[in-house]
């Protein structure tokens, strides 16, 4: 028999639409609950019945491998009936609006909807039209809350804390929902955040988010405890932001020489998918300081914790 969870944390929100709005206590509660699921997922029997009788719909308007499969595994391990909705074969391809899709789905009474959409703010709009809980699995360049939570869990398990750490977020900050969610979370938890990118890949006024800004890797990685690399999101670019991939790697790609600017025990992170030889070298990505594979493992645990914490708030829970 699977032992009862020690954590009784309940997320005091109906939806998880972003890190913005979460308190330090909310984040700590989710991370503590996630820790229990890390241990459960390493056992032979990985099942719990927290979501038995509940319906979870994964609605992805953008292609995804890691996030969608991670949410599917998380839901099934909690006992939910999980449905993956293929947008390519859905009514939206035939002209149905996002709001019509939301109303149609709501008529089927799903308990939890996990939604990814290419437009910033689309997930929040959909959440207004449904009765169940909605989890933002990434909306445009806006937010990706579960990625920030799994990154925080990975850091905390390796460093023992978040407060006071120097975290360098490097690469295409302008188009990255991962960067935005991580900045919000890390600032809330007392870390020191530094963004490192060429000027063309930095949002205007990024300093107002409470970050330091560096425009070269030597300055940006100096004294860093965590080096978080971001890929070039060419699918969101409507022009040329870098001269070439080769030149970008020369100045901003993470290799062993640039990693040496950081602390000797710095962790290397990447949300995936990686473009080896563009933003990160294979030797570093697969090296002893890399926790990239661990991030994937933490993703399932975090998404189980989020589903559990929201389910505890559902009617008849």
UniProtKB/Swiss-Prot annotation:
Enzyme Commission code(s) on record: 2.1.3.2
GO cellular component term, pick one: cytosol
Swiss-Prot/TrEMBL GO biological process terms: 'de novo' pyrimidine nucleobase biosynthetic process; 'de novo' UMP biosynthetic process; amino acid metabolic process
Pfam families the UniProt entry points to: OTCace, OTCace_N
Residues that bind L-aspartate: 94, 177, 231
Catalytic activity: carbamoyl phosphate + L-aspartate = N-carbamoyl-L-aspartate + phosphate + H(+)
Keyword Transferase: yes
GO MF, one annotated term: aspartate carbamoyltransferase activity
Pathway: Pyrimidine metabolism; UMP biosynthesis via de novo pathway; (S)-dihydroorotate from bicarbonate: step 2/3
Residues annotated for carbamoyl phosphate binding in this entry: 66-67, 116, 144, 147, 272-273
Keyword annotations: Pyrimidine biosynthesis, Transferase
HAMAP family in alphabetical order: Asp_carb_tr
Assembly with partners or alone: Heterododecamer (2C3:3R2) of six catalytic PyrB chains organized as two trimers (C3), and six regulatory PyrI chains organized as three dimers (R2).
NCBIfam families from the UniProt entry: asp_carb_tr, PRK00856.1
Protein family per UniProt: Belongs to the aspartate/ornithine carbamoyltransferase superfamily. ATCase family.
Function: Catalyzes the condensation of carbamoyl phosphate and aspartate to form carbamoyl aspartate and inorganic phosphate, the committed step in the de novo pyrimidine nucleotide biosynthesis pathway.
Protein name: Aspartate carbamoyltransferase catalytic subunit
Provenance organism: Rhodopseudomonas palustris (strain BisB5)
Taxonomic classification: Bacteria, Pseudomonadati, Pseudomonadota, Alphaproteobacteria, Hyphomicrobiales
């Amino acid at each position: 028999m699977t032992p009862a969870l020690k954590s009784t944390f309940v997320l005091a929100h109906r939806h998880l639409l972003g890190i913005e709005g979460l308190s330090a206590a909310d984040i700590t509660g989710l991370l503590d609950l996630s820790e229990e699921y890390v241990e459960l997922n390493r056992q032979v029997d990985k099942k719990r019945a927290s979501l038995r009788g509940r319906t979870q719909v994964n609605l992805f308007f953008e292609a995804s491998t890691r996030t969608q499969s991670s949410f599917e595994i998380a839901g099934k391990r909690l006992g939910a009936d999980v449905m993956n909705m293929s947008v390519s074969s859905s009514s939206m391809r035939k002209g149905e609006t996002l709001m019509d899709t939301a109303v149609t789905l709501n008529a089927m009474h799903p308990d939890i909807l996990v939604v990814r959409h290419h437009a910033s703010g689309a997930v929040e709009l959909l959440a207004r039209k449904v009765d169940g809980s909605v989890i933002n699995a990434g909306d445009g360049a806006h937010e990706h809350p579960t990625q920030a939570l799994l990154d925080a869990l990975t850091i905390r398990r390796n460093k023992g804390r978040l407060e006071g750490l120097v975290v360098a977020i490097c690469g295409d900050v302008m188009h990255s929902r991962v960067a935005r969610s991580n900045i919000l979370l890390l600032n809330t938890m007392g870390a020191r955040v530094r963004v490192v990118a060429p000027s063309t890949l930095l949002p205007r006024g990024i300093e107002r988010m409470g970050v330091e800004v560096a425009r070269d890797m030597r300055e940006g990685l100096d004294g860093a405890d965590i080096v978080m690399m971001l890929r070039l999101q060419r699918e969101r670019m409507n022009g040329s932001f870098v001269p070439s991939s080769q030149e970008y790697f020369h100045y901003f790609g993470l290799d062993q020489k640039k990693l040496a600017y950081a602390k000797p025990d710095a962790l290397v992170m990447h949300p995936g998918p990686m473009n080896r030889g563009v933003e990160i070298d294979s030797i570093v990505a697969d090296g002893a300081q890399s926790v990239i594979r661990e991030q994937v493992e933490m993703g399932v645990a975090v998404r189980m914790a989020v589903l559990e914490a929201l389910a505890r708030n559902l009617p008849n829970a």
